[in-house]
């Protein structure tokens, strides 16, 4: 690399095997056309509808573990709360600071976990992503199970990625069909889609690091501490 400063953060020229491959931030070669590998990784046939994204309660007032999200920071605490129940399910409709978080295994184990989350910043709709370290399972934060179902179905069809849904409508989506993590498209083609997804997320969430928080939600090493 040829760089303008010793910190190396902005290379002006990049060479590979003696050949100039990038100049002033632009790749000079041809897009990869060798075909996609590691597709069809969305093994979610066990999901059957919006009911999969609701949390059953054993009694009229349901005590359940709630994840507390630090604003623009990591998930760091878990407490038990008694939440209202409607028709046998935990109801968050009357509390704008509550949402639901769901992690669905997409690698063939047919398992999912649903838990309330407080202070994430989302007040309506649903956000879903398969970029979720380290397991990269389908991870969703949502207020509406119907929107969560639509987001999950959108990513099943696209092979993974990110989807934002509000009132039954997909506001934005980014398809990442290679293992649910990568795209075969060029940076120039992807950039507008990424910007659209980021805008849609920001419109639904108060925090500006919502996607980053979601991408570490399923990381066991970053799990919430239980404060009983």
Short names for language-model regions:
Residues 1-228:
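Active-site microenvironment of metallo-dependent hydrolases
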């Amino acid at each position: 690399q040829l760089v303008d400063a010793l910190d190396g953060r902005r290379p002006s020229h990049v060479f590979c095997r003696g050949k100039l491959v990038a100049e002033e931030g632009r790749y000079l070669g041809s897009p990869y056309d060798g075909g996609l590998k590691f597709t069809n990784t969305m093994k979610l046939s066990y999901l059957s509808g919006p009911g999969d994204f609701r949390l059953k309660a054993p009694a009229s007032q349901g005590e359940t573990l709630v994840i507390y999200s630090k604003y623009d920071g990591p998930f760091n605490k878990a407490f038990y709360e008694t939440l209202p129940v409607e028709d046998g399910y935990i109801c968050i409709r009357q509390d704008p600071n509550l949402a639901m978080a769901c992690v669905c295994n997409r690698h063939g184990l047919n398992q999912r976990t649903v838990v309330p989350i407080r202070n994430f910043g989302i007040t309506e709709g649903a956000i879903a992503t398969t970029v979720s370290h380290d397991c990269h399972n389908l991870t969703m934060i949502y207020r509406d199970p119907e929107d969560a179902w639509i987001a999950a179905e959108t990513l099943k069809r696209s092979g993974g990625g990110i989807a934002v849904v509000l009132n039954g409508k997909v506001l934005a989506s980014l398809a990442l069909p290679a293992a649910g993590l990568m795209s075969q498209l060029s940076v120039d083609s992807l950039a507008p889609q990424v910007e659209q997804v980021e805008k849609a997320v920001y419109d639904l969430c108060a925090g500006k690091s919502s996607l980053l928080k979601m991408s570490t939600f399923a990381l066991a090493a970053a799990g919430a501490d239980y404060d009983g």
